[in-house]
Amino acid sequence: MAKKIIGFIKLQIPAGKANPSPPVGPALGQRGLNIMEFCKAFNAQTQALEPGLPIPVVITAFADKSFTFVLKTPPATVLIKKAAKIDKGSSKPHTDKVGKITRAQAEEIAKTKMPDLTAADLDAAVRTIAGSARSMGITVEGV
């Protein structure tokens, strides 16, 4: 018989930098999970990624205090800001443009995000990424 699931925990943790301090410690502690075991496993799986890149993770907590976790792709906004070489999006996205990305950059981001997007093909994924970029005040050339 399958283990009884007691809950899901969704967090965004910088790659390779999981530690017992908030938000990780309290979120896992209230479910009675081993915090250090998670931190070591997460850091081991994310060591190949760019350090500090926020990685969404979904932790499944079981009744016997064990857990599994699934890593997602970095948020599209983080990848877009990195491609446009800016720190934050525009406070008035449709009025003030703060940067621009090319279609090739949007395609690269779409390929990275493809496992987590609901888009049927790459072109639809590129349009999704372009829409996210426009809502941040970033111009997308060629889309």
From Swiss-Prot:
The keyword 4Fe-4S does not apply. InterPro entries: Ribosomal_uL11 (IPR000911), Ribosomal_uL11_bac-typ (IPR006519), Ribosomal_uL11_C (IPR020783), Ribosomal_uL11_C_sf (IPR036769), Ribosomal_uL11_CS (IPR020785), Ribosomal_uL11_N (IPR020784), Ribosomal_uL11_N_sf (IPR036796). One of its GO terms (molecular function) is structural constituent of ribosome. One of its GO terms (biological process) is translation. One or more lysine residues are methylated. The keyword Aminoacyl-tRNA synthetase does not apply. Pfam families: Ribosomal_L11, Ribosomal_L11_N. Belongs to the universal ribosomal protein uL11 family. Part of the ribosomal stalk of the 50S ribosomal subunit. Interacts with L10 and the large rRNA to form the base of the stalk. L10 forms an elongated spine to which L12 dimers bind in a sequential fashion forming a multimeric L10(L12)X complex. This is Large ribosomal subunit protein uL11. It comes from Paraburkholderia phymatum (strain DSM 17167 / CIP 108236 / LMG 21445 / STM815) (Burkholderia phymatum). The lineage of its organism: Bacteria, Pseudomonadati, Pseudomonadota, Betaproteobacteria, Burkholderiales. The gene is rplK.
